């Protein structure tokens, strides 16, 4: 456990009942999303009701978009009057680890990058209802990042299908609701009903894909002559060029002339600047469909596999 780190105190109202206080005691290791990083916060600031906008409760994709605007924090202690949470972005910059409860239906392995997604699995409830305070705590599910990306991609596909339904295949597609991970069969029951979040995800996805495809094709057409010149000396480049690629064959047949760019005293040929920008942009394309990893599992002397329900020591993802 880390020491001497930034901690946020979430005040528990005095009117809480004993059963609700006991329910909060079992929330150690869960993750809450802070609207701002401050020393003092109210419990209502991290409750599910704080995500409601315009009187409408967000669905699964809406929660994902809201997660990106907030700061994840791991609950380290639950005291009678306050909850102590350690913000991942700030508190874990010091040396050490914090314990994260594995509430997912799959195991977390040492070294796994972990992403946080809303509850999406059948038969799984992560809500803690505090009747005396009229508040609900809906905790995210920590998942290995590859699994989280596949789940969110399926959710976006479901939303796109609802946005533009196919009359030939009415109803839901069962293949979108079932996936397999490490031999386990997982069923999705996520709520995707509001089209605003689907439109936001779809717009970002399409714009990024169009940019990446257009700029990437331009870079390939520009680099093909140089790759052909290197193919006689580099075996890897030669094998790469021997691949039956439509883009490669089209570039060899068409071989368009590179546009003559205006040069001035402070500007070089922007090919490599464009390549760097495209690589950075392509790397961000995956983050559009899922949250970036928040933490990484790091077990020192314990078991390398953390089962569902157990505590997993985690460090801040680099």
Curated annotation (Swiss-Prot):
Complexes and interactors: Interacts with TRX1 and major capisd protein/MCP.
- The protein's name in its UniProt record: Triplex capsid protein 2
The protein's matches in InterPro entries, at most eight in alphabetical order, are given as: Herpes_capsid_2 (IPR002690)
List, in alphabetical order, the Gene Ontology terms for molecular function in this entry.
structural molecule activity
Its localization reads: Virion; Host nucleus
Q: What is its main location?
A: virion
Which protein family is it in?
Belongs to the herpesviridae TRX2 protein family.
Annotated keywords: Capsid protein, Host nucleus, Virion
Q: Does the keyword Calcium apply?
A: no
**Briefly, what is this protein's role?**
Structural component of the T=16 icosahedral capsid. The capsid is composed of pentamers and hexamers of major capsid protein/MCP, which are linked together by heterotrimers called triplexes. These triplexes are formed by a single molecule of triplex protein 1/TRX1 and two copies of triplex protein 2/TRX2. Additionally, TRX1 is required for efficient transport of TRX2 to the nucleus, which is the site of capsid assembly.
- An annotated GO cellular component: viral capsid
Q: Which Pfam families match?
A: Herpes_V23 (PF01802)
Give the taxonomic lineage as stored in the record. Answer: Viruses, Duplodnaviria, Heunggongvirae, Peploviricota, Herviviricetes
